[in-house]
């Protein structure tokens, strides 16, 4: 997933945080799963395309896809992010 998003220029960077254990309810049952958290660095204007790519390629019926706004960031980093996600 990470490689796909970066190669399609939908993300400038994707960090994988592994060895997570998620506890949740699914279809009336308590579940525990090992998961990998992806932190996807992209522009908000690409959200719908990123979401579509994740939904198409993810094994979960309802994967967690949330968007957190960047309230502040270094100008050089944000410029790099914009450049790497430009078409």
Identify the role of each PLM range.
Residues 1-87:
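Positively charged, small/polar-rich N-terminal and surface patches that mediate targeting and assembly
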């Amino acid at each position: 997933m990470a490689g796909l998003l970066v190669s399609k220029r939908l993300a400038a960077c994707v960090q994988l945080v592994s060895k997570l254990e998620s506890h949740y309810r699914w279809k009336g049952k308590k579940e525990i799963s090992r998961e990998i958290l992806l932190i996807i660095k992209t522009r908000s204007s690409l959200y719908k395309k990123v979401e579509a790519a994740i939904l198409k390629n993810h094994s979960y019926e309802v994967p967690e896809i949330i968007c957190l706004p960047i309230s502040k960031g270094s100008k050089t980093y944000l410029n790099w992010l914009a450049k790497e996600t430009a078409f």
